[in-house]
Amino acid sequence: MYYNYYLKYYSQSGFFLENNGAIMYNYMYMKTYYIRTYGCQMNLHESEKLAGLLENAGYTLATEPESADIILFVTCCIRENAEQKVYGHIGALKQYKAENPDVVIAVGGCMTQQKSAAEKLKQKFPFVDVIFGTHNLCDFMRLLEEKSGRKKTLIEITEDDCESENTPMTRSSFPNAWVNVIYGCNNFCTYCIVPYVRGRERSRTIPDVVAEVKQLVGSGYKEITLLGQNVNSYGNDLKDGGDFADLLDAIGREVKGKYRLRFMSSHPKDLTERLVAAMARNENVCHLIHLPLQSGSNDVLKRMNRRYTREDYMAKIDLIKKFMPDCAVSTDVMVGFPGESEQDFRDTLDIMEKADFASAFMFVYSRRGGTPADKMPDQIPEEVSKARIMEMVAAQNARTAEHSAAYKGRTIEILCEDFDEKRGMYLGRDEYGRMGYFKSDKDERGNFVNVKVTDTNGISLYCEKI
């Protein structure tokens, strides 16, 4: 999955950023940039920071790469497919770069942080100008300056995280905003490359996060999503204490107004009663939690180093429903992990049915070099994994459709995010993350709108404005 920077993330529809001009500095003409972002919300948020750095230096947003002075790729390496997309899009620029040698092509993000990845990228695409890692975001403008006049690719990959909290930012997802609360991951699941490219966990302080959320709500943002590879680990590294439940309480206590608060992602082993209780008592926190399952087989979970059992996971589901009976739970699930038997797969389908997920991101295991799982025996044949994922998707899609159908006739509140030109309807999400479409005679973007659900289709709700 990738996102052109000018696209609105939640709706993934063509929403061009408004641009009110930029400081000219000493440039003879208005220089432009284009960012293509792959992967998760964390990457999208880092693209907002890179855009802020560029606009602070006088650049303006281009709507196509061919009209930009700087073309920037923010990459993902969570699965092989993500890397292949990056290679394809960079390769497509070879002729354009040859015809426009002054155009700067820069590649950063998780893919480049992998061991030997930068050199591989340089050899494969020698026309790329700058390659930088996940910890070099703060240095991007310096790297551009150092590259000026150099013919060879400039590579800078460091292991020490830069603190990018105060980086200038151009947000692209109004009325939604992303706020990092914790960086990195300490879990080392055997299939996952993230700890190797994102580093160890580092939490921002509660006052720092609260101040950013307060500023965003004061500026008119209506939905704030707190981000981290594992938000449930928030505060473990802070000397003065405070965990994620304390953070939710602090935001609820100090940030007033009508807004929604979401967060992602949560590791099941770290989901506590304290946190679930904090969700329940803070009225701005949405009753939606993304709780990655990955597998419903205890044997597979052990080989994944997930550090919980299927019984532990279902206990977390029961805990959530105890405090918030209406809470929607979404998840991540993979098939085809090394050694996954037919019974392991059936165990996963069983727990998906019992947990009754509102929605799920389902995918086939992807080998990642440098992870323990890559060296495990009994890699699953592609045809077996494909058959399993098709069966899983069909079962979950039917379940998701049932969840949607239960909405019919209900009145819900939607935060309007965009206008769908093809449908001729406004769109937005309710508290539980369900997408709703409706018509209105006025521009509703950024507004909370009460609607009645008249029909459903899969995950979508079709509504009438009240």
Region locations from a protein language model:
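Generic beta-strand/beta-sheet core signal
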Residues: 36, 227-229, 264-266, 292-294, ...
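Conserved SAM/AdoMet-binding glycine-rich loop
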Residues: 104-107, 114-116, 218-342, 353
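Short, positively charged and aromatic/hydrophobic N-terminal segments
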Residues: 2-10, 15-26
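Short flexible coil/turn linkers enriched for glycine and charged/polar residues
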Residues: 172-175, 185-187, 285, 295, ...
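Conserved, mostly hydrophobic/aromatic
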Residues: 189, 209, 226, 263, ...
